[in-house]
Regions:
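Residue-level signal for pocket-adjacent positions within structured domains
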Residues: 1, 16, 37, 69-70, ...
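N-terminal cationic and glycine-rich segments that engage phosphates or anionic surfaces
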Residues: 1-63
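Short hydrophobic/aromatic patches at helix-to-coil boundaries
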Residues: 3, 155-158
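Conserved NTP-handling cores and scaffolds of large molecular machines
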Residues: 18, 22-25, 69-73, 95, ...
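Generic alpha-helical hydrophobic packing signal
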Residues: 52-55, 68, 140-142, 149-151
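Structured, basic alpha/beta domains of bacterial-type, RNA-associated proteins
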Residues: 61-80
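Non-DNA-binding regulatory cores of transcription-related proteins
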Residues: 75-150, 156
C-alpha cells in the first residue's frame, strides 16, 4: 500500500466528512429505505431503489475515505524546514504575467485537490512547475490550456 501525501487540514476535512457520512447520512438513508419498504411492492418502488442507490454511493464514499486515511502520509508544512521554497503544503501567491491576474494556490495531495477551492495537486502541471521555486521567481508552465507565465509573489507555510 503506497502512502499518499496529504496536508493536516486535508486529513481533518476527510475525518469530518467520514463522521458526517457515518453518523448523519447513513441513518437518514436507512430511515428512507425503511419508509420506502413500508409502501409495499419493492419491484416498482422508485423511492426504495433511489434510497438503495444512495446507500451504495454513501457506503462507497465511506470505504474510499477509510482507504485514503489508511494510506495517508500527513505532512505538516508548518514543521518543515522550507528555506522559502515552494513545497508540498505551501500556499503560493502568483501573478499571471500574461493576464495580470493575481491568484493564490495551495499545493496539496491528490485526494484533497479541488481547483474551485484553489487547492492544486502537487503533481499537476502547475504544481510541478511551482515545487522547488522561490519568491520572485518567474516560471513558465505548460498546461493543457497552453503555456502560462507566472511570477511567484509570496510563499506561505500555513
Amino acid at each position: 500500500m503506497d502512502k499518499e501525501p496529504i496536508t493536516s487540514a486535508g486529513l481533518e476535512s476527510l475525518k469530518e466528512e467520514l463522521i458526517f457520512l457515518k453518523e448523519k447520512k447513513r441513518p437518514e438513508i436507512v430511515a428512507a429505505i425503511s419508509e420506502a419498504r413500508s409502501h409495499g411492492d419493492l419491484k416498482e418502488n422508485a423511492e426504495y431503489h433511489a434510497a438503495k442507490e444512495e446507500q451504495s454511493h454513501n457506503e462507497g464514499r465511506i470505504a474510499q475515505i477509510n482507504d485514503i486515511i489508511a494510506r495517508a502520509n500527513v505532512i505538516d508544512v508548518t514543521k518543515l524546514n522550507n528555506d522559502g521554497k515552494v513545497i508540498f503544503g505551501s500556499t503560493v501567491d502568483l501573478e499571471n504575467l500574461d493576464t495580470g491576474e493575481k491568484i493564490t494556490y495551495k499545493i496539496v495531495g491528490r485526494d484533497e485537490a479541488d481547483l474551485q477551492k484553489k487547492l492544486i495537486f502537487f503533481q499537476s502541471p502547475i504544481g510541478k512547475g511551482l515545487i522547488g521555486k522561490n519568491k520572485n521567481d518567474l516560471v513558465e508552465i505548460k498546461t493543457p490550456a497552453g503555456v502560462r507565465n507566472f511570477e511567484i509573489k509570496n510563499v506561505k507555510y500555513i
